Amino acid sequence: MASKKPENMSFESTIEELEQLVEQLESGDLALDEALRKFERGISLARAGQLKLDDAEQRVRILLSNSDDAPLSDFSDVAE
């Protein structure tokens, strides 16, 4: 079964598969070729996940900037 392209996966599915790949790579039980293939897949997943996060952050900033009454602040400054 062919793997889905990372850009076509949900963020949650991307992270789930990435976690599975990390576990497999950390086990040390893979042949070099298999480990390299999984590493390459992991890099693709990590990049796609980062793009999804960047897109979500940009969308939040746009939504907040459309509200004239709401000042923009960093996520870390939000009170818990």
From Swiss-Prot:
Subunit structure: Heterooligomer composed of large and small subunits.
Subcellular location: Cytoplasm
Family: Belongs to the XseB family.
Identification of the protein by name: Exodeoxyribonuclease 7 small subunit
Keyword Nuclease among UniProt keywords: yes
Catalytic activity, as annotated: Exonucleolytic cleavage in either 5'- to 3'- or 3'- to 5'-direction to yield nucleoside 5'-phosphates
Gene3D superfamilies documented for this protein: Exonuclease VII, small subunit
Gene of this entry: xseB
Keyword Hydrolase: yes
GO BP of this protein: DNA catabolic process
Coiled coil: none
Enzyme class: hydrolase
Annotated NCBIfam families: PRK00977.1-1, PRK00977.1-4, xseB
Organism for this UniProt entry: Vibrio cholerae serotype O1 (strain ATCC 39315 / El Tor Inaba N16961)
A GO CC annotation given for this chain: cytosol
EC number: 3.1.11.6
Pfam families per the UniProt record, alphabetical: Exonuc_VII_S
Top-level taxon of origin: Bacteria
Keyword line: Cytoplasm, Exonuclease, Hydrolase, Nuclease
